Design a protein with these regions (language model features):
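Conserved beta-sheet core of the metallophosphoesterase superfamily
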Residues: 138-197
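Active-site neighborhood of phospho(di)ester-bond hydrolases with catalytic His/Asp-centered motifs
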Residues: 4-6, 34-40, 80-85, 134-137, ...
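Short acidic-hydrophobic surface loop/beta-edge motif
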Residues: 124-130, 173-176
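Beta-strand-turn-beta hairpins that frame and shape the catalytic cleft
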Residues: 1-3, 126-133
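Active-site neighborhood of divalent metal-dependent phosphoester bond hydrolases
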Residues: 44-124
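A general structural motif
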Residues: 30-33, 76-78, 130, 157-158
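Short amphipathic alpha-helical segments
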Residues: 17, 49-50, 93-95, 147, ...
């Protein structure tokens, strides 16, 4: 069994929901082969462009938020994670404001998030599993219709797609045919979010 963890966006995560996810993983440990976070593990609020020149940029909580992630990742027994728009904020912020830090290993996302120490595999291009690919969901345009962002990514990649990003849960097929005969069906699955709002 593969467990997909939706966007946590720590510190905005729903603590009860995350606790229930941790319990589920513990209860089914023997059956689970992978636990994959779908990106946006941290919100990186202080690094966001909307926070620039506002009090949000000066909260000095990023280290604490990262430490919360480490604890949650351990409890969830995360094995893999993929890139996402919120986790991109670290490199983007450094590139825009402090480019001299770009070659500092501690500020590279996998190291900052503690992935090597947690034995978590980092997949910056998404994670391919058989005829599925796990993507964050921001790789192309988004749709307001649940499941449709993932379905469009399925059409684009030619693979079944599971994604986060849009904060909706949905499962939508994309079926092709020729001469009245079905040739294939691809699935787009959006996994929702784990935020407390």
């Amino acid at each position: 069994m593969i467990v997909l963890i939706p966007d946590l966006q720590i510190p905005l995560h729903d603590k009860q929901f995350v606790s229930a996810l941790c319990q589920f993983v513990a209860d089914h440990k023997k059956r689970i082969t992978r636990v994959v976070t779908m990106g946006d593990e941290l919100d990186f609020t202080s690094m966001g462009r909307w926070s620039e020149s506002t009090p949000l940029a000066y909260t000095r909580q990023l280290g604490n938020e990262r430490n919360q992630w480490v604890k949650i990742a351990e409890d969830l027994q995360v094995t893999d994670t993929i890139r996402s728009n919120h986790t991109d904020r670290l490199a983007t912020g450094i590139m825009r404001r402090l480019p001299g830090l770009l070659d500092v290993p501690e500020f590279e996302l996998p190291n900052f998030m503690g992935l090597p120490e947690l034995d978590i595999n980092w997949h910056p291009q998404g994670l391919r599993l058989a005829d599925w690919i796990l993507l964050h969901g921001d790789e192309s345009g988004t749709s307001q219709i649940a499941g449709t962002t993932a379905r469009r990514l399925a059409e684009k990649t030619g693979l079944n797609v599971a994604c986060g990003h849009v904060h909706r849960a949905g499962l939508v097929p994309h079926t092709t045919s020729i001469n009245g005969k079905l040739t294939r069906t691809l699935w787009g699955m959006e996994v929702g979010h784990a935020m407390d709002y």
